Amino acid sequence: EEFAFRRFDRLSGGERQRVVVAKAIAQNPDLFLFDEPTSDLDLRNQIEVMKTIEELVSDPNSRKSAIVSIHDINIAARFADRILLLHEGEIKSEGTPIDVLTEENIAEGFEVSCEIIQSSGDSTLRVLVKDEIKL
């Protein structure tokens, strides 16, 4: 609603991204295909958009599914039921976030070293990238 009367070319990148996601949801398809739906958003809005998508597909009465292309490893770890890890156009690994997001897969796919931190009480994991950026 907050963007309804504003011209699209007057919106910021993040606002445009949220409008595009809202338009896709308004179409009410059975299958959503999102290509980087959080790319221009700050962290709070990334989580808000992904929670909205998660709510759409987790409702047992809706029978909706979503395929989300995303480069943020931690957002994928938090929201994905299944992950396809692609490297140079080929599927390198497929499965749950815990199965796919291993230090070896991330090192090969993203060419960075990392540490996987898994919560002991549940299946939550976090990827801590260790590589430093040289200035």
Language model features with spans:
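ABC ATPase nucleotide-binding domains
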Residues: 108-135
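Catalytic Walker B motif of ABC-type/P-loop ATPase nucleotide-binding domains
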Residues: 32-35
